[in-house]
Amino acid sequence: MAEDNYNLAQADLRIVSGEQGSGKSTLATALIVDDCYSHLTGIINTDTGEYRKAQPLNENEIKSLESKGITYHLLKHIRVFSNVDDSSRIVVKPKGWVIDSPIRVFTNYQLFGIRHKLIGAEDIIESINDDTITDAWLALDESVFTDKQDSMTSLVKMVAKFMAQARRRMLHVIIIAQEASMIATRFILFSTTRIECSYDEDTYIVDYEVSNNSKVMQSSFLYAPDYWKFFKTREIVKQPQYKVDKILTEMYKPSKR
């Protein structure tokens, strides 16, 4: 479980950085997944579509489990209700079922087991004057529209204007990059939290240090395999097609003689 020691009730822009293979995407995914599981309202059978009301365990239920020698895990233990009567019981979430959660999630990389919407730059631009992307998580993994090298383009400038509305939109933004210096300055200025990751291949632990605007540094960790099933660890995040087309056009443009 990723330990989130800052208030999710407030809008936040987190910059998650670290070298390749440091667990950046794992941590970003963990923050989103943990929030969805903490607010789950049901579970759905992926084969039959059957729906069962469910909820996360409360503090007393967690203590009761642990008093029996059972180690509680947010992603495993839930209370499920009967579809016949009002009875319920604590179970380990069965295989083949995904959670139903009111938490809204927008990402530029694929997630599994969590309801979300894949978005590109055009989705952000098109929603800048409406409330489509509000009260939600917005995670951008090594995205071209936060890249410092493109900081003077109209695209990045417009996305930056959108990010400036993060608090009013109640967004929990995560920008992922190998180095914070690779992110356009505007986003650095808007950031409220910096997270630096490192990964231990022997223990499968992602260690991370969190600092916020109060200069308080906190260290924590998570067990990476708990979250690998929620995303493709080797997914290649696609670049906007118009940028690819533009470069190809320039490459194959006849040379002047």
Q: What spans do the regions from the language model cover?
A:
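Pre-Walker A adenine-sensing motif
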Residues: 1-8, 41
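Conserved lysine of the Walker
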Residues: 24-25
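Conserved P-loop NTPase motor module
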Residues: 1, 193-195, 207-257
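P-loop (Walker A) phosphate-binding loop of NTP-binding proteins
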Residues: 19
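Conserved nucleotide-sensing/catalytic segment adjacent to the nucleotide-binding pocket
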Residues: 114-169
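Hydrophobic anchor at the beta1->P-loop junction of P-loop NTPases
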Residues: 16
